[in-house]
């Protein structure tokens, strides 16, 4: 099943690793699955298939994609923010599928940043951040592979990361867990924004943008493509269940 998903859709082939046995994909239950399964959008649409396939429903070219908007404060970081800075290894024992540990995981998001970052992403003693949009430079999410990295950002309350480029494993984990939108900017937005700026991210096929209301500047973002519906659904397993690609948890 996983192999057919990958061959049918190039984006999924970058976000889903095939298991050794076909049956293991259907029975595997990741600790990184969101516990609030009701978060799957009611207007969920399967990925657009470039070729005829019974596994996908082709969306009409005339049918507009729903615009998704995130509005809030920005938290700005630089280049090469690695996963140790996003969530230090000492907190990897927390299990995101446990609601209490999921919330606690969010309180440690970006706690590994150096002291040069005077403003904490999550204030000491708080469980959530006041920053809903993270703006970074090149190679965001580099370092060791850990699903906790995008999960902790989503648990803290972040909705999107806008960076000049990503480490591929962080991008894949962001899509697979469905926690945050990893969006690519066409210019170095991190050099023109400041932590605390008020911004809006608008996602729509072909014309995604970031608007910095504090400076009045607007930046074009690269389309996230077919990865968008997977994140909307809450991750790759929630997406596959919703699309009927694997049995639902209740089956």
UniProtKB/Swiss-Prot annotation:
Disruption phenotype: Embryonic lethality when homozygous. Keywords: Amino-acid biosynthesis, Branched-chain amino acid biosynthesis, Chloroplast, Leucine biosynthesis, Lyase, Plastid, Transit peptide. Pathway: Amino-acid biosynthesis; L-leucine biosynthesis; L-leucine from 3-methyl-2-oxobutanoate: step 2/4. One of its GO terms (cellular component) is chloroplast. Its EC number is 4.2.1.33. GO terms for biological process: chloroplast organization; gametophyte development; glucosinolate biosynthetic process; L-leucine biosynthetic process. InterPro entries: Aconitase/3IPM_dehydase_swvl, AconitaseA/IPMdHydase_ssu_swvl, IPMI_Swivel, LeuD. Its main location: plastid. Expressed at low levels in roots, root tips, at the basis of the hypocotyls, and in emerging leaves. In young seedlings, expressed in cotyledon epidermal cells. In hypocotyls, expressed in peripheral cells. In seedling roots, expressed in the epidermis, including root hairs, and throughout the cortex. In rosette leaves, expressed in the upper and lower epidermis. In roots of adult plants, expressed in the root tips and cortex of the mature root enclosing the stele. In flowering stalks, expressed in the epidermis. Expressed in the carpel epidermis. One of its GO terms (molecular function) is 3-isopropylmalate dehydratase activity. It holds the Pfam family Aconitase_C. Residues 1-59 form a transit peptide. Catalyzes the isomerization between 2-isopropylmalate and 3-isopropylmalate, via the formation of 2-isopropylmaleate. Plays an essential role in leucine biosynthesis. Functions in both the biosynthesis of leucine, and in the methionine chain elongation pathway of aliphatic glucosinolate formation. Plays an essential role in female gametophyte development. Belongs to the LeuD family. Heterodimer of the large LEUC/IIL1 subunit and the small LEUD (SSU1, SSU2 or SSU3) subunits. Plants silencing SSU1 exhibit stunted growth, narrow pale leaf blades with green vasculature, abnormal leaf adaxial-abaxial patterning, and abnormal flower morphology. This is 3-isopropylmalate dehydratase small subunit 1. It comes from Arabidopsis thaliana.
